[in-house]
């Protein structure tokens, strides 16, 4: 049995983008674990794709295509990137790699030749790498210790540092740099410097491969690199379904009485154990790990070129004949062109086979999904003490400790209210009717609607497996569900969340607060939550308690209706020569900090007793752990908040916020001159008056009442992120409003629910933002929609309609009232994109392109969207939304109807608007 090894390559690429395909062959042929590259000549944001590998860069500080280094590492290895060192005199990319002999820092080092180095510079550089490292790179230092006939000043300084014995040089003793200038002597510039490893553990050799004036070096460390644990599912994809179902049919023979909480936990445990047994019996007998890296299959012509180039390279290294160097350069160019043609042919074949239907397994949408989200490389995380997390396991603990603090309630509520809440929660219930029983048919209907592409929770039970359960298993499951409702106890196994952290775009990746938690909950628990929610929504007290101005988490409600309310209110103020003063409030960590006693206090007043007990059990004793690269943190408690990712969570938050202040506290203006608009935790409050002082006073009255409500229920408002906007055609702005003594910053425009609302509601800033976002998205999809590629025209049009166009038309039923000069910018974006997609010549008219591609013109699109929107408003379940529809406007009392003074459109005018 061969000893496990870690293979580390080193290469000065002189430009990595040109040699990426040849590097891919090199990585495959030698099964390289870590590749250290220098002189990558890559700009910030520039990427190359190497399947199965991750790349961490240290760019030149100028941002230009010069210098730079990169660590290319197998994605399945346990590693943690460190902050790169990027200055004019050094570019060092580094990662922490976990091996069987401990964690080692692997660094790619490039030291430009023009900079002067002294002994202290080398000492500080090595100190930054730690006590155990392997640093390979182009040091531009010559000395006899690593194979140079002559020494340079930098080489002498480096040799002086190494001579103390703490560091060792790992080199082949052969030249690695063969200049294109025949007058320059070959020299050894590329080598490794190690610390903390005995030389007996390391082997090194020079390879006559890759196209550059530097030869690659391969070092072998006799240690086993640790691999990330693989996340598996309970039932394998190629399992025998018949065996799985047959074994579960035995659940019909289980005779189990469930009378109390312990029985429910035992029944849940029994059900999962039976599922695990069935999955193991159904698993394929010859299960083996599929190797992720296979040698590339290359055509014979390219293999011949590779062999010939290597022979010529060896001959040139042996003889130094300039003619051999010229032949090698020509062969390298031929190889580069051949690899480029092969890559383009592969892309053409791939694009030609893409499709948007089931016959191609929806391959078009699979590939576009990969490019819709901006890729975020892994980053090092700072721990609370200011140091760096060296391993993925350390990351999990740092994230978990941070979340544990976040899942803790604030302490603002007065003691008198806390006592009142506590006393009420301990008071006895009133008599009520029993809940409707869960039937087998109800369970089947819920399971049939489960989405298949959802990650499983801690129990590894995914929705695909649940859909395969036989009736006997579903009957046992229905028994558990009914017991949960009868006993009023939510199983403990369904209250554990596995959390993964997702980086927030634009935030510092090294900060632990720059990551958003995403919870993976047990699927069976989610089904139980849906059953509870269905029964909650039939309670009239619950539906009445949630205010009408809350448009979030409600059926047949969306962001356009709430935006329409805000815009319509401001437009009416402008028509009446009034000021509309608005405050857009930011509730800090609204869902994570929900005060459980306060939520239960409100729930007990509204919910039937049995549902209240289940919800109470649902919130109590919840736990979580954080998962990073397959490693799990210790289990932490959740003391506050509604479970993120749960089915019940949104409705519970709506109940918690249901008693927030309405227009009642406002006395400075009339009731109809106050607008409250909430969508989930996004809250907007507007007041209007002919007097800017009266409108401001009315808004301040509401904010004072809202601040008092927030303190009573342990809610924190972040005044720094709140915004104050004045909507008016007149001069003058709100003199200022405050929250908890802090002045809210006044803005000329604010982005609310994805639409930028400016002072005069021209939507010019919003359309400018649309242009920027659309161009970015088009650039990301450019390789798919380019006119010369092999992707069919129909697929390109599908990409435009399904992925690109929604960026243009979101909220069109509201911002469509903008001036034609602004809307024309949207029309131009569509015209340019369609012309690019179709490859139409310059003389072809845009309207002909739109007709041939069956893409509606902007005016037709606007009318169609507005017409459907108005039809929906006319029959909307919410009376606040129905007031916005054309039917309500036409049938309104003429005495109360707003007189149209300004020459501008309102949203209900859009169905009849004609754009030329």
Swiss-Prot record:
Gene Ontology MF terms: RNA-directed DNA polymerase activity
The first-level EC class reads transferase
Q: Which Pfam families match?
A: Exo_endo_phos, RVT_1
Task: Give the CDD domains listed for this entry.
Answer: RT_nLTR_like
Report which superkingdom the organism of origin falls in.
Answer: Eukaryota
Q: What regulates the activity here?
A: Inactivated by sulphydryl reagent.
Q: Where is the Reverse transcriptase domain?
A: 483-757
The catalysed reaction is: DNA(n) + a 2'-deoxyribonucleoside 5'-triphosphate = DNA(n+1) + diphosphate
Q: Which cofactor does it need?
A: Mg(2+); Mn(2+)
Q: Which UniProt keywords apply?
A: Nucleotidyltransferase, RNA-directed DNA polymerase, Transferase, Transposable element
**The keyword Glycosyltransferase belongs to this UniProt entry's keyword annotation:** no
What name does the UniProt record give this protein? RNA-directed DNA polymerase from mobile element jockey
Organism, by scientific name, is Drosophila melanogaster (Fruit fly)
Q: Taxonomic lineage per UniProt?
A: Eukaryota, Metazoa, Ecdysozoa, Arthropoda, Hexapoda
